[in-house]
Amino acid sequence: MLTDRQLLILQAIVDDYIRSAEPVGSRSISKREDITFSPATIRNEMADLEELGFLEKPHSSAGRIPSQKGYRYYVDHLLMPHRLTKKERHYIHELFTKRIQEVEQAIQQSAQILSSMTRYISVVLGPEMFETKLKSIHMIPLTAHSVVVIFVTDTGYVENQTMHLPHSVNPVDLEKTVNILNERLAGVSLFQLREKLNKEVADVLRFHVTNYELVLDLLEKTFEAEKSEKVFYGGKTNLLSQPEFRDVEKIKQILTILEQDDVMHQMIRSSGEQIQVRIGHENNVEAFEDLSVITASYSIGGKHMGTIGIVGPTRMEYRRTISVVEHLSKDLTKLLTDLYQQS
């Protein structure tokens, strides 16, 4: 259990280090208006906090920096609520009301807003497909041998897939196929599409569509691609402006992980409605040992759909960043729910 004096000093050190990125000494702490202790007293308390694992001492400095244990305590017990300014709230609202008509467009926009407001990396997971159901399928010819397959889900999500057609598939067969798919697959979960396609739709196609096996194979591949949940990014190079990431090899390792959507999906995905903060080693990814990840979920029509997140240094401006993520998750939920109700 930390004393009140230790709590004040720990909070002062974390706040100063977040602001300056420089180790914090007892003299600079003693100059703060909210600290009334002498430099000698502060030094003793800093030594105790270091011994307890809340602070670390860089080799080349007399000052201290927060450890990951220190950041965790700071986030869990010392963080005061932060309210976005009216200007910041207006900025988010304005960007979200600029003719956004599709779910994916709204999600892409939220990634850009997050990265521009925080100066960190934003990661937004597209709607989870486990419970998402197909509403309708459309096919629009592009050329004599290719069409765009448009999927519309019950949440208003619209996805396009280009399908290349062999010469043996004719327009009449395509029209029949679309009618059969909409009749048989509307309301089916995206994760059950392939199963339904092979068990129920195949028998119907066999009687109505020439070269039905070829059409079936093309549809299977298209449906399989549709099951994947997309990951959207913003500000991937923002970490380059942070002083602790001047090591080229460290940046390379981080960017390599950011290119692996499956890894990022597992790391960012949130199952709860509350803000989640993972610090350093809590991310369970070696390249993210010096990074913190803040996430919140968003919903559509009251149903949990995806996650928005921020990746930044452990020396992150937690108060403001948490507030931005929280505010944006609520605004995105409202926007997507409105789009869902209009669809």
Curated annotation (Swiss-Prot):
It comes from the Bacteria. GO terms for molecular function: DNA binding. The keyword Transferase does not apply. Negative regulator of class I heat shock genes (grpE-dnaK-dnaJ and groELS operons). Prevents heat-shock induction of these operons. NCBIfam families: hrcA. One of its GO terms (biological process) is negative regulation of DNA-templated transcription. PANTHER family: HEAT-INDUCIBLE TRANSCRIPTION REPRESSOR HRCA (PTHR34824:SF1). Keywords: Repressor, Stress response, Transcription, Transcription regulation. InterPro entries: GAF-like_dom_sf, HrcA, HrcA_C, WH-like_DNA-bd_sf, WH_DNA-bd_sf, WHTH_HrcA_DNA-bd, WHTH_transcript_rep_HrcA_IDD. Transmembrane segments: none annotated. Belongs to the HrcA family. The lineage of its organism: Bacteria, Bacillati, Bacillota, Bacilli, Bacillales. It holds the Pfam family HrcA_DNA-bdg. This is Heat-inducible transcription repressor HrcA. SUPFAM superfamilies: GAF domain-like (SSF55781), Winged helix' DNA-binding domain (SSF46785). It comes from Halalkalibacterium halodurans (strain ATCC BAA-125 / DSM 18197 / FERM 7344 / JCM 9153 / C-125).
